[in-house]
Regions:
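Double-stranded beta-helix
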Residues: 34, 44-109
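Conserved double-stranded beta-helix
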Residues: 1-52, 56
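A short, hydrophobic secondary-structure junction motif
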Residues: 27, 90, 131-134
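Short, surface-exposed loop/helix-turn segments at secondary-structure junctions
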Residues: 16-23, 69, 73-86, 138-144
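Non-heme Fe(II)/2-oxoglutarate
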Residues: 101, 105-198
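Short, solvent-exposed aromatic-acidic interface loops
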Residues: 8, 54-57, 143-150
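Short edge-strand/loop segments of extracellular domains
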Residues: 9-10, 54-59, 126-132
Length: 198
């Protein structure tokens, strides 16, 4: 299991959308390798996920055509290709409590939607088979360490990439988190289940 970050956009946010459509699976990995997703804590139709329907099927072809070969699990899709794929664009309407899953090869991005339209809060989730060869003992040790430290990771449970302690604030230090002021949740009754997932 990964310990993905969260996404929070307040209702008053007036940021404008940009094209940053991407695939979260490396060009040199063409098969279904990972389902990623989120649990939505708010209902959203404006500030939501945008997917490009069935693009997981052209993942290999797309990166070959663009002559892109790498092992990075985050690759931007060319802006002109995104515009040309407009008929495949699906802006998801997501009710509160929904679990949304997609193949990591799928071209996708979040959008802000109409200014000052709605609050958005989601918790990202991702699971991969525990018995995979890339899920080494070292990865398990790291996952336990980061779980105890309450750190978040990338979408991929392995190889594990830990995120910074502070959220992306784009220079606004007033949005930094003072972790000493937070109340720790008591999750003792869930620990055996958590240990099994880790």
């Amino acid at each position: 299991v990964s310990f993905d970050g969260s996404c929070y956009v307040d209702k008053e946010c007036k940021k404008k959308d940009a094209i940053w459509t991407h695939s979260d699976q490396a060009p040199n990995n063409n098969k279904l390798a990972c389902y990623q997703g989120f649990v939505s804590l708010t209902g959203n139709k404006e500030r939501t996920l945008v997917v490009y329907d069935k693009t997981h099927r052209i993942h290999n072809e797309y990166f070959k055509r663009r002559n892109i070969v790498n092992s990075k699990n985050w690759n931007l899709i060319d802006k002109h290709d995104v515009i040309n794929a407009g008929k495949l664009k699906r802006v998801l309407r997501v009710p509160a409590g929904a679990l949304v899953l997609w193949d990591s090869r799928t071209f996708h991005q979040n959008q802000y939607g109409a200014p000052a339209s709605e609050e958005r809060m989601v918790q990202y989730v991702c699971f991969l088979p525990k018995n995979h060869t890339k899920n080494t003992e070292q990865m398990s040790i790291k996952r336990r360490k980061y779980f105890k430290e309450r750190r978040t990771t990338s979408h991929w449970p392995y190889p594990l990439c830990v995120n910074a302690m502070q959220p992306r604030t784009f220079g606004d230090k007033t949005k930094n988190i003072d972790y000493t002021q937070l109340t720790q949740c008591n999750i003792d009754k869930y620990m055996s289940e958590i240990e099994n997932m880790i």
